[in-house]
A protein has these predicted regions:
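Glycine-rich, small/hydroxylated-residue low-complexity segments
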Residues: 1-208
Length: 208
């Protein structure tokens, strides 16, 4: 069983000469069975050469075998600009690869040991990023900042009203945590049946 971690830093991320700030990414892949992981990489490398549109049976089986080893994946990106930071944290620990039974029985949460997604974004940093992107559309800085402020404030307002986001002073946050069989969004419990129904509708819409 292997644990691995990496940190990547990009100083001065630019798009068409526009400075979006500095990006750092902390990643980890823990509780990994080395042999199974090597098989997974080999199968997907071979499949990439064939350019299949859909997953092959071999890919499905090796993916399930890998997930059944209960790996943990951590992905924490942070973007910093002159106004502040935009940070998020994704931490997923798998428990089972029996997707068919889990979805069929409405036991979605049983697939995970835990699932954590958190976001903490400085509002001024959000506006700064949005304004920089809008300036790529040839808006001047003043107009871009005005539009960015309106868009960000409206997005935050709608997110707060829907219970997706929480305003905390100068920051906006999102906290989605699944632990011990209970899913909470910003502290509010989301029933497993509701999640199962949403996933079912999503799968049905993708099949059309």
């Amino acid at each position: 069983i292997l644990d691995s971690a990496a940190k990547i830093a990009f100083n001065g991320v630019t798009v068409r000469d526009a400075d979006l700030g500095d990006l750092t990414i902390d990643m980890a892949l823990n509780h990994v069975d080395g042999e199974t992981f090597n098989q997974l990489i080999q199968v997907y490398n071979e499949s990439a050469k064939q350019q299949h549109d859909e997953l092959t049976d071999e890919e499905v089986q090796i993916t399930k075998k890998f997930i059944d080893t209960q790996p943990q994946f951590i992905f924490n990106p942070t973007l910093s600009n002159k106004a502040g930071k935009l940070a998020s944290n994704l931490d997923i620990s798998m428990a089972s690869a029996d997707f068919e039974n889990a979805i069929g029985q409405g036991k979605i949460f049983s697939l995970f040991n835990h699932f954590i997604f958190k976001m903490d974004a400085n509002k001024e940093a959000l506006i700064e990023e949005a304004a920089t992107v809008l300036q790529l559309d040839r808006l001047d800085k003043e107009q871009a900042t005005k539009e960015a402020t309106e868009q960000v404030n409206l997005g935050i307002k709608n997110g707060v009203q829907q219970g997706i986001l929480v305003e905390d002073g100068k920051s906006v946050k999102l906290d989605l945590v699944l632990e011990k069989g209970e899913l909470k969004l910003n502290g509010n419990v989301i029933p497993e049946e509701q999640v199962a129904s949403m996933l079912f509708l999503l799968v049905m819409s993708m099949g059309q």
